[in-house]
Amino acid sequence: MWFSRKQAVNVAPKSTAGGAAALPKQVTTKSRGDAAESAARAYLVGAGLRWIESNYRTPGRGGGEIDLVMRVPDGTLVFVEVRQRSSASHGGAGASISAVKQRRIIFAARHYLMRFASLPPCRFDVVLVHGALSGGESPQATIEWLPAAFDAS
């Protein structure tokens, strides 16, 4: 099922006690990714999902990582991949989710599901964050949520 929900969100930095905006000292790929995951998590919680876990990793090399594990009110477990790109010059955020990346996410999800005696229904969502999340006076980003973006078959 392919449909998306888009929303522009203002992710301006919070002011400090002195009124000045608190910006990160150095913007790194990791800090951008962390900001995108935080924005995606807040967006999904606002849409009614419940946060379970962030950055679940399988042990050992060659495993996978799940950015967010969420649950919808009907009990479905949602494995969320968050992708952020500040520009579309290299195809945008969605273009970076290859078949190999999907297989790694599915592998990690199967590992995660081993903790359950009976398997809950689950799906794989993608949240795309288009635009810059840090820097500038009023940074804007558009969040696009793709429920059931791919499946494990």
UniProtKB/Swiss-Prot annotation:
UniProt record similarity statement: Belongs to the UPF0102 family.
Listed name of the protein: UPF0102 protein Pnap_0271
Report the source organism: Polaromonas naphthalenivorans (strain CJ2)
- At the top level, the lineage of the source is Bacteria
Q: Which InterPro entries match?
A: Restrct_endonuc-II-like (IPR011335), tRNA_endonuc-like_dom_sf (IPR011856), UPF0102_YraN-like (IPR003509)
MF terms in GO: nucleic acid binding
Q: Which CDD domains match?
A: PoNe_Nuclease
Concerning Pfam families, the annotation shows: UPF0102
